[in-house]
Amino acid sequence: MPEQLNTRVEDCFQLAESFFKRPFKRPVVSLKLRGQKAGVAHLHENLLRFNPQLYRENTEHFLKQTVAHEVAHLIAHQLFGDRIQPHGEEWQLIMRGVYELPPDRCHTYEVKRRSVTRYIYKCPCADSDFPFSAQRHSLVRQGRRYLCRRCRNTLVFSGEMRVE
């Protein structure tokens, strides 16, 4: 766990405690998040999950904005309970009043799509390729057969692969 991330989470909690003059329960912090989300606050589990790739690629802004954004969700939940909107007035109050940051709902980080390998299958009758996913290719290797819709012959792996 990067020390800067834990330090920023703690700083955000201390700012909130100073502002609201009360203690807040600290969350478990995890870097087990993938995909497009930069961070997620699990309110009932008191858990913060952050995306390690987006953290590495946007460290400065991530520490300043994203960490505060997610901590603000936990603070709002501990203060106001379940009956508030995720990015409602209470959360916005914390973002503006406590952290002096804009209450932005979404990040603008560039998210790289992962590359996908396609395994090219062919049929004797057709001039076209049949790109199979890794999972489908694996099933063929285990004995599953896929048939051409035109001639009903078994599709055969051409040995060609494409990365998309």
Swiss-Prot record:
Recorded GO molecular functions are: zinc ion binding
Q: Which cofactor does it need?
A: Zn(2+)
Q: How is the cofactor bound?
A: Binds 1 zinc ion.
- Disulfide pairs? none
Q: Could you tell me the keywords of this UniProt record? A: Cytoplasm, Metal-binding, Zinc
Q: What does the entry list under GO cellular component?
A: cytoplasm
Q: Which SMART domains match?
A: SprT
User: What are the positions of the active site?
Assistant: E70
- What is a biological process (GO) this protein takes part in? response to stress
Pfam families in alphabetical order: SprT-like (PF10263)
Q: Which residues form the SprT-like domain?
A: 14-156
Report residues binding Zn(2+): H69, H73
Localization, per the record, is:
Cytoplasm
UniProt record similarity statement = Belongs to the SprT family.
HAMAP family in alphabetical order = SprT
Report what the protein is called: Protein SprT
Q: Tell me what organism the protein belongs to.
A: Pseudomonas fluorescens (strain Pf0-1)
Q: Which gene encodes it?
A: sprT
